[in-house]
């Protein structure tokens, strides 16, 4: 049981989807166009109360899934952005040492210090600074939050090992305080860009899904949902060009996020269709490495664009 007092959890909580189709509709209603395989694993993660591990290239929409899910369910989103060197004090908890020292000095100044009682007081919730992972275990009137552990591959194996208790039992053990266990498990989404392999022990505690680049039909649906101001012809050409450029030998292929950014940029330029000069001039929105940009500029941009248009006429 949680050691934290929380708000009345009897308040109305947004219902979880009762089927895969409802999961698809929930995501679509919040502006996320998912395929059925993603909706299936998300539905199962919600029903089985298991963490969901999403792996895939940067920019394919992994983080957005957690954001959309929290919004659609009316739940709080708690995000832990991972980075190299992330440790327990930044991700889970730390003690308010200044407050503890002040309490000790005041007690000693008053005389007759009960050491056991003083120790219990300074290691109480009053002096516990709760970080993202600990906050996610607390009761919430709006229902269990969505906990996003984003880009786990940026951390090290020691931090992965610490996460095992949270992902398997939804609890954290604090040596001076005790075990804090969620009364109702949070909805946990873990993402990785696969810059390194994540240990099997962590993956076994989660349901797994590889988030791939969308096919042309789904990417067009995403573009129309996120950038409805883009002309229909331009939207089709953008998607066809991006789909084609992903087949090229690039250091980093553009993700869906770059597709949307490019569409927004082209709309700002009052474009109604692509042309080679426009493509070359705006490649910096779509591609993020100079070698890739140089490879795709000029005659290569025209060649790809001609190929895309020829394919569209078939």
Please place each PLM-identified region on the residue numbering.
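C-terminal regulatory/interaction module of P-loop NTP-utilizing enzymes
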Residues: 1-314
